[in-house]
């Protein structure tokens, strides 16, 4: 009977070891996924910042053109 108990214990220990091994593999996969997601998030942040800079530059250029047009219209009014 004691041999049967040892076999059951061995089986339970093996199941626990297998479960731990699977969980360790899962943890490693999750760590890899985390690194990939962090990299992707950093790339997206960088792209967003670049787009914000381009947008700001376009707005500044737009404002400059509006000012030039106003100046030209003002000169045209003076001529008339």
From Swiss-Prot:
<feature type="region of interest" description="Disordered">
    <location>
        <begin position="41"/>
        <end position="60"/>
    </location>
</feature>
<keyword id="KW-0963">Cytoplasm</keyword>
<dbReference type="InterPro" id="IPR009252">
    <property type="entry name" value="Cell_div_ZapB"/>
</dbReference>
<dbReference type="GO" id="GO:0000917">
    <property type="term" value="P:division septum assembly"/>
</dbReference>
<keyword id="KW-0131">Cell cycle</keyword>
<keyword id="KW-0717">Septation</keyword>
<keyword id="KW-0132">Cell division</keyword>
<dbReference type="Pfam" id="PF06005">
    <property type="entry name" value="ZapB"/>
</dbReference>
<comment type="function">
    <text>Non-essential, abundant cell division factor that is required for proper Z-ring formation. It is recruited early to the divisome by direct interaction with FtsZ, stimulating Z-ring assembly and thereby promoting cell division earlier in the cell cycle. Its recruitment to the Z-ring requires functional FtsA or ZipA.</text>
</comment>
<dbReference type="GO" id="GO:0005737">
    <property type="term" value="C:cytoplasm"/>
</dbReference>
<protein>
    <recommendedName>
        <fullName>Cell division protein ZapB</fullName>
    </recommendedName>
</protein>
<dbReference type="GO" id="GO:0043093">
    <property type="term" value="P:FtsZ-dependent cytokinesis"/>
</dbReference>
<comment type="similarity">
    <text>Belongs to the ZapB family.</text>
</comment>
<feature type="compositionally biased region" description="Basic and acidic residues">
    <location>
        <begin position="41"/>
        <end position="53"/>
    </location>
</feature>
<feature type="coiled-coil region">
    <location>
        <begin position="3"/>
        <end position="80"/>
    </location>
</feature>
<comment type="subunit">
    <text>Homodimer. The ends of the coiled-coil dimer bind to each other, forming polymers. Interacts with FtsZ.</text>
</comment>
<keyword id="KW-0175">Coiled coil</keyword>
């Amino acid at each position: 009977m004691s041999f049967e108990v040892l076999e059951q214990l061995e089986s339970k220990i093996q199941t626990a070891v297998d479960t731990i091994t699977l969980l360790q593999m899962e943890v490693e996969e999750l760590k890899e996924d985390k690194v990939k997601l962090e990299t992707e998030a950093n790339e997206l942040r960088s792209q967003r910042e670049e787009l914000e800079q381009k947008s700001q530059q376009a707005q500044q250029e737009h404002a400059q053109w509006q000012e030039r047009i106003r100046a030209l219209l003002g000169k045209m009014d003076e001529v008339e």
